[in-house]
Amino acid sequence: MNKILCVASLALMIAGCADPSGQSKNNGYEGLVITEVAANSDKPMTDSWVEILNTSPREISLAGLGIYLFDEHSKGEEITILDDVVVGPESRIVLTTEDMTLVKGISSSADFEIVLGTSADKGIVDRFARNRDAAAVSTHKYGSYQRIPEKGGDWVVTSRSTRRIVNYDAKPNAIWVWSTHMDQWIADDFAVMKQMKDLGYDHILLNYNAFDDWSKAGKALEIIEKAKELGVKVHAWMQVFCENKTWVNPIEDLGGGEGRYKQELFDRIIAKANKYIDDFDVDGVHLDYIRFSGSGKNVAANNSYSNGVNASGAINEFCRQLRKSLDSRPEGVVVSAAMMTGSDVLHYYGQDPEQMGKYIDIFMPMVYKYYTSYSYNNAWMKTTCANFTGVSKAQVWAGIQTYKYETGVSGEIGMTPDEVLADAEVIRNTACSGLVLFRYALGSYPDLNTFWNEEN
């Protein structure tokens, strides 16, 4: 059974236990802790770094301290010198191979330990060991090892680093929210948002119209400001290859059997994603309609050209460019994608999870069980999830419904919390690590606070 617990900045967590043995308590460095380690020397074009937090109310000079590395090649080698570094009260510093404040990289692919102390074995202020503290798990290219909470908490493995910002636990439970429901979320001092937070829903996928419609943008800002106060992550729910409610082909037919990817379309969508981050400070972007329409001439397989341009290539290239753009920003922006389910998704829609997973942090397959004329069974739900788990380093949060259909009854029927929970428990018995409910204002919602901690 899956035992993955939660996401920090929308991040994958696997709890480990810190071992403070050997740490010095009276050396003038009390209050210093290692809060985050990005061990990336085994990953191309990616820096290693270590974040140190001063939890005390006073300024601390790091003169006399060093960071010492133990791995298969180094046996207590000092990899930085901290003589000229001073850390202010309740402040943090990052030592990185990028600026050579960390003179040697660290690899997460094998066991290692770093020690913050006056030497490798004396005056130890803090330490982190991969196998002991993080269950021998390596990190994603964009992830890190984080201590949560920062002041003496357990170490966890995350899919997104939080360099220079606070580490905190966000549960891997999300809900899709339309812009038309923002008034309900704001009313009565954000009573709905507080209720959803109390039930364990730490992520909101807020529809793009909340940001694009100038008459709604102010409400979106209110929601995001309150969400940050409550510890809730807001993701901009974008419609990628869909403009003005119409699907847009990302490939132009040049004639003669050749095609080209519409770079102008890619640029426009990527600029919009960056605008959501700049103007609204969203925590992530959620890609919907990152696919072909799947019907008629717009079946993905019908868009393949002799010069190598094809449907899955268009999707993968867009994801690559978006990832590159967002990784150039200082924020840890999470990228998730709504994924189609069913047979032959690559043929009809062009989505290739193995390739997309190089650039996407979280897959959110729409594991929708209920339709107007039929329903899938639990075995189908498990098989569908298995099509996404294990094919890449992307996390998989399954999208499930909060409504169903019944013969002789018109329209959707909202499900009870127990009914939604029953479907969620099917997901928990897969390798998925999170849930996304579709959608707010249909049905009721179970308490998921301890859902990923429980035995089933």
Model regions and ranges:
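Active-site-adjacent "subsite" loops/lids of carbohydrate-active enzymes
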Residues: 183-187, 219-225, 233-280, 413, ...
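Substrate-binding cleft of secreted/luminal carbohydrate-active enzymes
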Residues: 365-378, 382, 394-456
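Substrate-binding cleft/loops of secretory-pathway carbohydrate-active enzymes
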Residues: 334-372, 407-413
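A structural motif detector for short, solvent-exposed N-terminal "entry" segments of globular domains
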Residues: 20-72, 105-108, 135-140, 166-168
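Aromatic-lined substrate-binding rim segments of carbohydrate-active enzymes
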Residues: 192, 203-243, 302-329
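Solvent-exposed beta-edge/loop recognition patches
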Residues: 45, 75-154
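Catalytic domains of carbohydrate-active enzymes, especially glycoside hydrolases
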Residues: 187-212, 279-284, 356, 362, ...
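Aromatic-lined carbohydrate-recognition surfaces of secreted/lumenal glycan-active proteins
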Residues: 175-180, 235-239, 286, 290, ...
